[in-house]
Amino acid sequence: MLKQRLLTGAVLGSLSIWAMLVFPTPGLAALLGLFYLIGAWEWGCLSSLQTLARRLLWLLAVMLLTVLIWWLEWANLSSPLYPAVLLGWGLICWVLFRIAVVAQREQGQVSFKWLLLGLFTLVPSYLALIAVHGSHQWGPKLMLYIICLLWVVDTGAYFAGKRWGKDKLAPVLSPGKTWQGVIGGLVAATFYALAGLYWLDWQASSVGFVLLTLLAASLSVVGDLLESLLKREAGAKDSGKILPGHGGVLDRIDSLLAAAPIFVAGLAWF
């Protein structure tokens, strides 16, 4: 199992880095869009959309919202509406998250709150990554920075949690996560941000960049817990089986759903 997980991770990671640095933005948008659609399909399944017709309608809704926002040019980093839209997204997610914690659905019952939450997490996350990739000459490197940040946070949290972990972060949703692991992930993110200043040749506020990185790192934990809550409510261990040793696509992008939109929105203020 571990060998399979490492092999899948190595192949997926290598291909992702190559695509981000080599592909033009339209090509990357198509490739990443396919990846996100698979994640959206898994989200629909976890939300108890049991028929093919309902799942296809759900995918259509995701695609239509994506096209609509893109057409309105809200995914442009220079647009003042972009931070406002993502702020609204954050508020909606917070409200729906609270609702999801309080009100559990019966097994097999379609969860419309989760479907709505899926629209306002999957779509902004996807558009944020594509927007940052095509926004500047160093956009591909910045997108890679965001993706690698989550890997760094996960790695730091894993080793810190394994060494010092005692206090459970969310025993019901994710028994393996501890507060010590979260702190370890944030410490790793701090050093990563300092290295990123030089790698990206960052010319704006260094303190602001580090703080934005730490905010995104913190929110990545929220995204992870959010997906854990969705899977728990659906009675599923993984979001899917498409990635051997890793589960589904959602299991790989859950941290991005919360972190990427806010990080990219924060870039608009520099």
Stretches with model-predicted labels:
Residues 2-214:
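Membrane-embedded alpha-helical bundles of polytopic integral membrane proteins
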